[in-house]
Amino acid sequence: MSQGPPTGESSEPEAKVLHTKRLYRAVVEAVHRLDLILCNKTAYQEVFKPENISLRNKLRELCVKLMFLHPVDYGRKAEELLWRKVYYEVIQLIKTNKKHIHSRSTLECAYRTHLVAGIGFYQHLLLYIQSHYQLELQCCIDWTHVTDPLIGCKKPVSASGKEMDWAQMACHRCLVYLGDLSRYQNELAGVDTELLAERFYYQALSVAPQIGMPFNQLGTLAGSKYYNVEAMYCYLRCIQSEVSFEGAYGNLKRLYDKAAKMYHQLKKCETRKLSPGKKRCKDIKRLLVNFMYLQSLLQPKSSSVDSELTSLCQSVLEDFNLCLFYLPSSPNLSLASEDEEEYESGYAFLPDLLIFQMVIICLMCVHSLERAGSKQYSAAIAFTLALFSHLVNHVNIRLQAELEEGENPVPAFQSDGTDEPESKEPVEKEEEPDPEPPPVTPQVGEGRKSRKFSRLSCLRRRRHPPKVGDDSDLSEGFESDSSHDSARASEGSDSGSDKSLEGGGTAFDAETDSEMNSQESRSDLEDMEEEEGTRSPTLEPPRGRSEAPDSLNGPLGPSEASIASNLQAMSTQMFQTKRCFRLAPTFSNLLLQPTTNPHTSASHRPCVNGDVDKPSEPASEEGSESEGSESSGRSCRNERSIQEKLQVLMAEGLLPAVKVFLDWLRTNPDLIIVCAQSSQSLWNRLSVLLNLLPAAGELQESGLALCPEVQDLLEGCELPDLPSSLLLPEDMALRNLPPLRAAHRRFNFDTDRPLLSTLEESVVRICCIRSFGHFIARLQGSILQFNPEVGIFVSIAQSEQESLLQQAQAQFRMAQEEARRNRLMRDMAQLRLQLEVSQLEGSLQQPKAQSAMSPYLVPDTQALCHHLPVIRQLATSGRFIVIIPRTVIDGLDLLKKEHPGARDGIRYLEAEFKKGNRYIRCQKEVGKSFERHKLKRQDADAWTLYKILDSCKQLTLAQGAGEEDPSGMVTIITGLPLDNPSVLSGPMQAALQAAAHASVDIKNVLDFYKQWKEIG
């Protein structure tokens, strides 16, 4: 601050130079006075005194005048002083002394006001800069300066080019400051501005995409969510930006150190029997922690043992494949258990955005290793291609589940043992060489997730969705005492480091993050992988990466052949070892019943599968590849319309990740050629996906209302190279990413792009993916071939068929085989669930419990309204399956307006159903029940009991179909007093007698709970 102002140019008026000097001296004096205040030990008590607030306001006015009077020489310096002295240093002072500041105290209120005032000031400054320099930022930010409609044109601007550049970057920095202030607000109790802060940072990136600072701030904002994977993505994006931020390197290193600590702690943890939801969360945690640790090993300067790296790659791939089977019952809802405080909270499925970020992390890792010439480049390529293969497989599974929905409807809740006897043997013996668990059950659960609980959802009052928690026993915030001088001054912002505080308590009750700015996975059935020999999907290596190679089919040089040899050895270890995979079905809340329709595979169009050598005899089940997704959706009996297909494709959130990865592969054709034979599984799955997507001709003939740009794109959709390109959201999000720089050369990010609807974006995505299919079909090695007569893509093995007729016949046989496999897997899922139920029943066969406890509990409306905590304990004990009939839900609906207990019950049931808790299930009505309309008017309680009894008879009849006596299997737990039945009404007494005749017990919920506790 001791230095004087820069000498003004001779052409400047002398009065302006003198005015600038006076302003600068006034700024220096105000800064000096503020520094003296901050040096006191009790500065946090004085900083919000009126005289100090006035001093900061004076400094703010002086800085604004200075930056607009002489923006080129003083603008950046004035911005920095304004931010640091008026806002940031006050914020850091309060955060440092948070232990002295109590919740709802005068100081905390003043601090909140300070943040709000800062947001208001920078929003005003942002608008003023745009207005003063007539900047056109409509495509970048929300709060834009709108041209005066009375003038009808822009005002002339007499600013130089340097001044315009400063104004543009000043807007960028204002948005970063707004994001920081919103992030600080988010740390306060009772304030949720995380999404607002995130939006400001992304708008800053839109204004200046070459600056990496906002990504560092986004990493700090992410905190420990998803065990730091999201933060790792942001820090890597910052580091790989054109103008990176030095603080991101330290932040990333701390994440890697933390990942190593968590990884070794997880390895030491003894395995204990967990509930299905907790086991599911444990699998997700293991995947994300191992993925983080793997990325720390796949660094240019990392020294890791090859055996450890290979083993870790295998573990991550297995867990990735397993966890992709975990699907949410409702979008954007975390399935972490809320009522078991003794366990850590967790995540029960992988969001599409997180999977997208994991794929991009792999691409950034490959890019950095290649640029550094690291020996681990081969391992990174092998791992990335294998991970993408799993991703494509699961996209196929999910698309087929939606496209084939309706062929095998799910029956009502049943628990009978009517499985076909021949389906039991494969459960015991089946060994499949491919690592994917059977994908069939998700087809049923996922296909109905949008309407499974629609009735219960409509009973609730509108509420804000719950905030996904990011707590973890190993995810505490970072501690760092880094200096905030030189590094911050260069960027004009604090470098992050503020940690996301947990809500509750005081406003300052958590540490800061960085001072550098199936409903279950547990399974008693395991698929053991066999040695595959030559059929193993090993990946061979690429040569050194060439972003824009002149020759697509050129030979490998000596050094490239050495890399190929290394990668082949690595991939052989990674994909040929014998591994164990757990069955991971995603059950709906209705028990699955095996399908008896033998014609589900009938098709009038060929169905593409990756392996045509697979015979259709049952004996081949042992040796066939478990490519659960590799049967095309075109094998459906009822062919879906184009509109229906597009609705399914629009809803599939993994397609953007597939599209981006294929863009990267398109710029690395040598990698595709080298890996063509060894990664056959990937190309098989890709051929399935290509055939699931509608062709350009189908889209053009469908009469869809598409904008001219998309219609032009459709004209070249079936060509290897798209003649035109349209920007998609995923392309904008990855702007300036080095691994995709070659792929993005065909885009013009600076021109106005047409606003595409979700449907049009989906069509553009389809065009890009199908064009890639034609692109690799022309490459050397015949990786894929396109058969124009049938309109399908076929892989190498399929193209070896002698004739088109034989090829089509092989496709039909594979469709039939796939349908048989699907039925078998449904049978396996049914048997597995029955095994769990039998184990649950067996756990009750204690001397006292045998005659007293029932495995199935059916609460009535009164029990849920008045004794919800008791119901929660019974449901979470793991000893009972709680059945909720439709009648009970209707009763809660009637009472919700006047009874708060009914509203609590509705919220609880909705949350449990969305979690997929297997111990509490909703039961649909089957068949026609006897309607007692007169009784409904006379005695509503008796009528309700009869309706519940009708539902219970389904369970007792199902049990009676077997050899065991169904008596004592089902108990209705009611909130009504049953101590003296004689005082009950006549219809109620008759209902109790009917229950006894139906082998259904009826007990008061408190009496049942007391009896259960006594038995222990």
From Swiss-Prot:
Biased composition, class Polar residues, residue ranges: 594-603
Highest taxon listed in the record's lineage: Eukaryota
Residues in PINc domain copies: 872-995
Localisation: Cytoplasm; Nucleus
Gene3D superfamilies: 5'-nuclease, Tetratricopeptide repeat domain
Keywords: Acetylation, Coiled coil, Cytoplasm, Nonsense-mediated mRNA decay, Nucleus, Phosphoprotein
Modified residues (N-acetylserine): 2
Pfam families: EST1 (PF10374), EST1_DNA_bind (PF10373), PIN_4 (PF13638)
Basic residues bias: start-end ranges: 449-466
GO cellular component: cytoplasm; cytoplasmic ribonucleoprotein granule; cytosol; nucleus; telomerase holoenzyme complex
Tissue and organ distribution: Ubiquitous.
Location of Phosphoserine modifications: 2, 423
A single GO BP: regulation of dephosphorylation
GO molecular function: histone deacetylase binding; protein phosphatase 2A binding; telomerase RNA binding; telomeric DNA binding; ubiquitin protein ligase binding
Effect of residue 860 to A: Abolishes stimulation of RENT1 dephosphorylation
Quaternary assembly: Interacts with TERT, PPP2CA and SMG1. Part of a complex that contains SMG1, SMG5, SMG7, PPP2CA, a short isoform of UPF3A (isoform UPF3AS, but not isoform UPF3AL) and phosphorylated UPF1. Not detected in complexes that contain unphosphorylated UPF1.
Main function: Plays a role in nonsense-mediated mRNA decay. Does not have RNase activity by itself. Promotes dephosphorylation of UPF1. Together with SMG7 is thought to provide a link to the mRNA degradation machinery involving exonucleolytic pathways, and to serve as an adapter for UPF1 to protein phosphatase 2A (PP2A), thereby triggering UPF1 dephosphorylation. Necessary for TERT activity.
Protein name: Nonsense-mediated mRNA decay factor SMG5
Taxonomic path: Eukaryota, Metazoa, Chordata, Craniata, Vertebrata
